[in-house]
Amino acid sequence: MVKKTKSNSLKKVATLALANLLLVGALTDNSAKAESKKDDTDLKLVSHNVYMLSTVLYPNWGQYKRADLIGQSSYIKNNDVVIFNEAFDNGASDKLLSNVKKEYPYQTPVLGRSQSGWDKTEGSYSSTVAEDGGVAIVSKYPIKEKIQHVFKSGCGFDNDSNKGFVYTKIEKNGKNVHVIGTHTQSEDSRCGAGHDRKIRAEQMKEISDFVKKKNIPKDETVYIGGDLNVNKGTPEFKDMLKNLNVNDVLYAGHNSTWDPQSNSIAKYNYPNGKPEHLDYIFTDKDHKQPKQLVNEVVTEKPKPWDVYAFPYYYVYNDFSDHYPIKAYSK
C-alpha cells in the first residue's frame, strides 16, 4: 500500500489544475471556431436561366408548369441566394417568385419591369420597350439595398428590352455581402458579325465600373453571376474575366450549362447544337475572397411533363433549356 504524502497531494492538485486549463482552452477554441463560423459571409448561391419567355409568343414551353417544377426541385432548396435569368413572362415569373418565397423571403422585383420596389434605378431604363430585363435575386437573408441598372446599349432583340443587372447588399450574420445578377447580350444574327461580343464587353465594364464607384469596403465580398453568354474555353472567356475584374473558379458537375445533347428543351430548338458553358458565378478581384469558389453544373431533371399548344402536345423532362449552377466555397 502506497502511503499518501504531501508531495503526492500536490501532484494531484497540479494534475487537476492542468486538466481544467486544457478543458477551458478546448472550450474557448471551440467557441472561437463556432464564432468564426457564425461570422462567415461565404454564400451558397444558385444561378439559373429559367427560359420564361412570353407565353403569348411562346405558348409551348410550359412556363407556368415549370414555375411549379422549379419551386419543387431539389437544386433550388438549401441555398442562401438565387439569381434568376430570363424571368420575362410576368405571370410565370411572379408565380416562380411566389413559389420560392417561403425559403427566400427577401426578393427583388424583376429587372426593368418597373421602377417600383427599387432603392434606385440607373442606366438606360425605358418604360416603352417591349420586354423587361428578366433578372431577379431572392435571398434567405435580408436584402438591405436593391439597385437596378439597365445597360446603355444592346443589339437585336436585346435592344428592345431593359436588360442590365441587379445589385443587392445582403446582411448575413451582421455583415454585408454583395450579389450582382445579370444577363448580358445574347448572340443574335441581327447584331451583325462580332457586334454582340463587343456589346457584351461594354456591358461587363459597366458592371465593373459600378462596383468601383459603389466604394464597397474591401473586406466585403462581391459576387457577380448569371447567364453571361460567353462560352468557357474561348478567347472571349479570358476577356470576360478581365472586363468583369473577376477571378476564375473551380468547375464541377456537367461540362456545360446549355446542352442540346442532354437537355430536351435545348434539343428541340437546336437539335444539332454543340454544348456551351454560358453561366457563371464569380467574385470581384478587389474585394474579400471566399474560400476556393466552385461552380457546379446541376443536371437534375423533373419527371416528364407535357404542354399543349395547338395543335400538338409537347413533352419535356427539364426545368429549362439551361442547367442551373451552384456556387459554393470548398
UniProtKB/Swiss-Prot annotation:
Q: What is its EC number?
A: 3.1.4.3
Q: Which reaction does it catalyse?
A: a 1,2-diacyl-sn-glycero-3-phosphocholine + H2O = phosphocholine + a 1,2-diacyl-sn-glycerol + H(+)
SUPFAM superfamilies membership: DNase I-like (SSF56219)
Q: Which domain of life is it from?
A: Bacteria
Q: Cellular component per GO?
A: extracellular region
Enumerate the Gene Ontology biological process terms. Answer: killing of cells of another organism
One of the Pfam families matching this protein, by short name: Exo_endo_phos
**Which CDD domains is this protein grouped with?**
nSMase (cd09078)
Which GO-annotated molecular functions does the record name? phosphatidylcholine phospholipase C activity; sphingomyelin phosphodiesterase activity; toxin activity
Disulfide bond sites = C155-C191
Signal sequence extent? 1-34
Keywords tagged on the record: Cytolysis, Disulfide bond, Hemolysis, Hydrolase, Signal, Toxin, Virulence
Which InterPro entries does this UniProt record tie to the protein? Endo/exonu/phosph_ase_sf (IPR036691), Endo/exonuclease/phosphatase (IPR005135), Sph/SMPD2-like (IPR038772), Sphingomyelinase/PLipase_C (IPR017766)
Protein purpose: Bacterial hemolysins are exotoxins that attack blood cell membranes and cause cell rupture. Beta-hemolysin is a phospholipase C with specific activity toward sphingomyelins. Has a high specificity for sphingomyelin, hydrolyzes lysophosphatidylcholine at a much lower rate, but has no activity towards phosphatidylcholine, phosphatidylethanolamine, or phosphatidylserine.
NCBIfam families in the record, alphabetically? sphingomy
Please give the subunit comment from the record.
Monomer.
Q: Which family does it belong to?
A: Belongs to the neutral sphingomyelinase family.
Q: What is this protein called?
A: Phospholipase C
Native organism? Staphylococcus aureus
**Phylogenetic lineage:** Bacteria, Bacillati, Bacillota, Bacilli, Bacillales
